[in-house]
Design a protein with these regions (language model features):
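A structural signal for short loop-to-beta-strand junctions that line the ligand-binding cleft
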Residues: 52-60, 83
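Bilobed "Venus flytrap"/periplasmic-binding protein-like clamshell domains
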Residues: 1-8, 22, 66-125, 130-135
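Conserved beta-strand segments of alpha/beta enzyme cores
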Residues: 16-18, 54, 105-108, 143
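Extracytoplasmic small-molecule ligand-binding "clamshell" domains
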Residues: 1, 7-47
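Conserved small/polar residues in nucleotide/adenosyl-binding loops
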Residues: 147-149
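A ligand-binding cleft/hinge motif common to bilobed small-molecule-binding domains
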Residues: 28, 32, 40-51, 116-145
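Short active-site-adjacent helix-start/loop capping segments
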Residues: 27-30, 39, 47-50, 63-65, ...
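Small-molecule pocket liners
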Residues: 61-70, 142-143
Length: 149
């Protein structure tokens, strides 16, 4: 998103950048603690930090039809889902799941790339997938799950 700035492709004068790469939960944590000047965050965190940060006009990743998916192992009865792996407690994915399924309270933050394999191994009843996890879950024997409320 900021390739030209951080890789010296444009003249920034005296301005320099220290670039660090973290998963979204760690980025959210650092922004919440005020540890960064510029950071990618989850939209769900914005209300908590907007007094200290300004939302930029570019670099956003919000779209229609490509949001998180809720998956479980094939054949898992929806009413048996209790333990759910989420990509972070302050993520938009967790906020959406919490709003749709308020009865699920046993949520555990897991690195987004490890959620689908952990659900496939039976470590969690279900998981909320973002990024590439949304496209590979079927290969791991997982399926979309809807919980009856």
């Amino acid at each position: 998103m900021f390739d030209a700035l951080v890789n010296g492709r444009i003249d920034c004068g005296e301005l320099t950048f220290e670039v660090a790469y973290y998963d979204i939960e760690e980025l959210n944590r650092r922004a919440e603690a005020g540890e960064t000047d510029v950071s990618k965050i989850s939209y769900a965190l914005l209300p908590e930090i907007q007094s200290r940060y300004t939302l930029l006009d570019s670099g956003s990743a919000l779209g229609r039809g490509n949001g998180p998916v809720f998956v479980a192992r094939q054949g898992t009865p929806p009413d048996s889902i209790r333990r759910v792996a989420v990509p972070g407690m302050h993520t938009t994915a967790n906020a959406l799941m919490s709003r749709l399924y308020p009865s699920i309270t046993q949520k555990k933050p897991v690195l987004f790339s490890e959620i689908a394999p952990a659900v496939a191994r039976g470590e969690y009843d279900a998981g909320v997938l973002i990024h590439e996890g949304r496209f590979v879950y079927r290969k791991l024997g997982l399926e979309l799950s809807l919980i009856h409320i």
